[in-house]
Amino acid sequence: MNYKVLLTLCIPFASWAAADYTEQDAMRVQAVKTYIDNVLQEGRSQIKTTPLLADGINTTTRKPVEWIYPDGRTATISNFANQQNFLRALTAMSVVTEDQRYQLEAVRITRYFMDNFIADNELFYWGGHRFVNLDTLELEGPQNKNSVHELKNHYPYYPFLYHVDPHATERYIKAFWQAHVEDWQSLDMGRHGSYSKNYDDKVFHRPIPASLVDQSKLPIMPETKGLTFINAGSDLIYAAYQLDWLAPSANAQGSAAWGQYLMTQYKLAKHPKTGAPVYQFTSPKKREWPPQSDKDTNSKYGDRAARQFGPELGDIAREGNVLFKSNDKSIVFNNALIELHLAEQRNDAAIREQVVDALLNFYRLAYNPENGTIKPIFSDGTSIEGIPLARDGYYGPKGRVFNAHKPKTEEYLLPILRAYRLQADPELWQLAANMTHHYGWGSLGNDAKAKPTLNMQLSSVSPMTLFSAIELYQITQQPEYLEFARAAADKLVEKRFVRGYFLANPRYLNASIDAIEPLALLTLDATLKGKTAQVAPYLSGSGYIHGEFAGKENAYDTNEIYKQTR
């Protein structure tokens, strides 16, 4: 791995001295090795001999998983966009074992994909609605989604892709923006990109327009045809900044400037009084008169939140202001991790402060420190907790009730700790201390200098437990956090390493090869060996395929395939 790639694969914070390494530490790495070996052996086609891998494996039959079309036809799924954390795990395995075979395997897989599955307009054939049939090498996709290009919270491993093929990676990022932005003056963009839209090598040469968001009109947002979901926008932002980082000699391309412009629109659209972040910075423009039935929620009929909540809540009822129904997670988990990574990578104080403000303003409104739950709110703080929906709509059927929820894992905690590592705001520490208390961790103490009292016998752990504990160790250098991470890692292997794969529930039948557990375990091992900075950081990443599946019109593989039970 050359010096430039090493820099781009790194977590920018320092690696500290190695800890004493034990036999138990080695056993955890052996579990990951077994998992990787199983994926590489059982995840390949028995019909077509290629380096490509299936997205998942049936842990009973040991065969690749399949997409089932409404007519009963099946296709073995190989979606490279849904395998990016597996690539990160392969490169991390080479770091901790000093065995380059794993990274070379990652190169082989990546090169084959990039040599064979790029469209004429330079888009990759991957994402939420497009994949390769592993057994035929034909392109596939759910029929009701028109096989469009879509990335939402995917966050590809761009530094590694660039290492393998700089030319294809650069052209892909340009094509990604070209395909998803319909109007560059209004930044009318959408989550769906066309494979037939022409490639433009000078896509980032366009002049930056004036900001679209007029803060004097908030909470009413400007109207566009496209849907500016932050889970799609953050992938565009990340890609633009990564192109600038990886190819700085081509800085005149303006990719970072466009990434900053898009990021700024979300910032400008935050609520003017509470400062709470938003999910969109525009509202869908009404292009047709809505039907009588509220169950038809196509965005061409206008803002779905205004239709469903407007009569009761007024102007705040806009899609961008909705901070529930998983919108909050996309903002304060996925997007926060990406922007924190960019802030650290570029040493950009403005991005860092923007993320810290968004996190604090959201949790001041939504978080209940008494029980560790998060309320369903709009960006002005209006809560709909316990209130039945008055009518059918995009956010659920009439009568549905949204309640406060406690995240099942520490995913909301992780960005708070990463933010604190970059900007030691005492309010962030107190928030983290309260959250960990409700997860049964014990006590972090009043500040980062305090000696923690930690529960080494957690009954429930996840990869987020490990990542969060590692952040605390990086922040404090307190050995208790490292021992806590080791104990959590042992429990993680005990509970989730099942039939040679990592499963969130041992009763699940199919294992995704993009499981996060291996990267979490290898990040811990790298930390123990003083090699944290050589391992690719965890940036979330939520790969999926969405569309018609086995007779269901609106299905996700994450539910229909990976939550099947034995």
Please place each PLM-identified region on the residue numbering.
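Sec-dependent signal peptide recognition
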Residues: 1-8
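A ubiquitous, low-specificity "background" feature that marks scattered single residues
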Residues: 8-10, 520
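Hydrophobic h-region of N-terminal signal peptides that target proteins for export
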Residues: 10-17
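Glycan-recognition and catalytic cores of secretory/periplasmic carbohydrate-active enzymes
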Residues: 18-566
